[in-house]
Structure formats: C-alpha cells, structure tokens
Amino acid sequence: MREIRLSGLMSGDGRRGALLPRPSSTLQIKGKKRHVLVDTVGLLLHAVVHPADIQDRDGGVLVLSSLFGMYPFLFKLFVDGGYQGPQFYSAAAAILPQLSIEVVKRSDQAKGFKVLPKRWVVERTFAWFGRCRRLAKDFENLSRNAVAFLRLASIRLMLRRLCNPS
C-alpha cells in the first residue's frame, strides 16, 4: 500500500449579494466570503461560506476546524497572505499537527497584476465556479445552500473531466 501525500491550496473569495426584492429588510444580504480548499489540480476538497464581516485569517480557522479528521493525508497547505498570523498558525497546529503551511505572498516591488505560483490554481477554480449560473452571483440566503451549489459545481467539473479526457 502506498502512502498518499496531498498538498492543498486555500484562498478566499468575496461575493456580493444579488439585488433581488426581499420580503423584509432583515433578509437583505450584504455579502459572503467563500473559503475553498483545493488540491494541486484545482478540484474542490472543502468549502466554507460565511458572512463577509469575518477576516480571512479567522475564516481560515473555521475551514481548518471543520477539516478535523477528514484529510489525514494532507501534509502541506499553500495559503495567500490573508491567512497570516499567530492565531491561524496555532489553530492549524492544534487541529492538524502534521500540516506544514506555506504563505504565497506578492513581492513588494511588483506593480500591477502578477501571476503568483500555486495561487493561480485557486483563482482558476473560482473562475470555473463563475461559469456556473448559480455561482456567478450570490443568490442564496443560506450559507449551507451556497456550499451545496459549490459542491454541485465541483461534481459537474469532475464528471466533465472524466467523460471528456481530451
């Protein structure tokens, strides 16, 4: 039996709510953040959706706490600069002690758009999700519905890759 070692990439994406008529002002959604954990190919492993008033660092702790026991073969995690800080690192060490975290940051001298290594895989996954009509804009009132549609879109992508290997 061979040991499987998986590297994952985690990033967040902000999504603004759709401008749909609501029955009351209490249901008005201002925005949500989607944190996804993908493998090195860009396929979804895990997703968490929460209100946009939570910082990326705290959202990363939410993602890691919901991962407990799910991926024992996850050994390396590439994250973007928003997931830095002692709180995130201590939570990662407590939840997944075998996990090694590497922060992919932009250089200070870079001007304009720059493709970052490893980070483009997550951004490409968000672009794939953007092709799905229900994920192009946030139409969901509940976060669990948004996660369900992320998973459905990921299943659709995986099936399309299996059926069309070209």
Task: Please place each PLM-identified region on the residue numbering.
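N-terminal polybasic/positive-inside topogenic patches
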Residues: 23-26
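Polybasic low-complexity intrinsically disordered regions
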Residues: 29-102, 106, 150-153, 166
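Basic, amphipathic alpha-helical segments enriched in Lys/Arg and hydrophobic/aromatic residues
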Residues: 2-9, 13, 17-18, 89, ...
